[in-house]
Amino acid sequence: MNQTVKVKKKKKTITLGVVHIRASFNNTIVTFTDIQGNTIASASAGGNGFKGARKATPYAAQVTIDRASEKAKEYGLKTISIRIGGPGAQRESAMRALFGQNFVVTSILDVSSIAHNGVRPPKRRRV
């Protein structure tokens, strides 16, 4: 008559967080963190079923934001600060998708790295 009792782990409630959006030429990666930088939820366009060139579309970024914010809302996240980086075309649609999720946005910060004559860029495509 040995019975094991399962104890359900209580999720932390985090009301203030940071959203890191990395929009590259090939993919979009979204990470929700708390103020200390501990990851709450993350998602990417490739992980949401988009493959190849479709990962770099604005629609894929929108779906990625929706999935990641669903996970983050389970922790009680209400107020966010946005840090967006990268040269991708999906930056604008990712921001619009975040505004549609009913979060209180305190700040928007562009953290794109700017090369001061760093590595040589890839050659131009000849189609």
Curated annotation (Swiss-Prot):
<dbReference type="InterPro" id="IPR036967">
    <property type="entry name" value="Ribosomal_uS11_sf"/>
</dbReference>
<keyword id="KW-0699">rRNA-binding</keyword>
<dbReference type="InterPro" id="IPR001971">
    <property type="entry name" value="Ribosomal_uS11"/>
</dbReference>
<dbReference type="InterPro" id="IPR019981">
    <property type="entry name" value="Ribosomal_uS11_bac-type"/>
</dbReference>
<keyword id="KW-0694">RNA-binding</keyword>
<protein>
    <recommendedName>
        <fullName>Small ribosomal subunit protein uS11</fullName>
    </recommendedName>
</protein>
<dbReference type="GO" id="GO:0003735">
    <property type="term" value="F:structural constituent of ribosome"/>
</dbReference>
<comment type="subunit">
    <text>Part of the 30S ribosomal subunit. Interacts with proteins S7 and S18. Binds to IF-3.</text>
</comment>
<dbReference type="InterPro" id="IPR018102">
    <property type="entry name" value="Ribosomal_uS11_CS"/>
</dbReference>
<dbReference type="Pfam" id="PF00411">
    <property type="entry name" value="Ribosomal_S11"/>
</dbReference>
<comment type="function">
    <text>Located on the platform of the 30S subunit, it bridges several disparate RNA helices of the 16S rRNA. Forms part of the Shine-Dalgarno cleft in the 70S ribosome.</text>
</comment>
<keyword id="KW-0689">Ribosomal protein</keyword>
<comment type="similarity">
    <text>Belongs to the universal ribosomal protein uS11 family.</text>
</comment>
<dbReference type="GO" id="GO:0006412">
    <property type="term" value="P:translation"/>
</dbReference>
<dbReference type="GO" id="GO:0005840">
    <property type="term" value="C:ribosome"/>
</dbReference>
<keyword id="KW-0687">Ribonucleoprotein</keyword>
<dbReference type="GO" id="GO:0019843">
    <property type="term" value="F:rRNA binding"/>
</dbReference>
<dbReference type="GO" id="GO:1990904">
    <property type="term" value="C:ribonucleoprotein complex"/>
</dbReference>
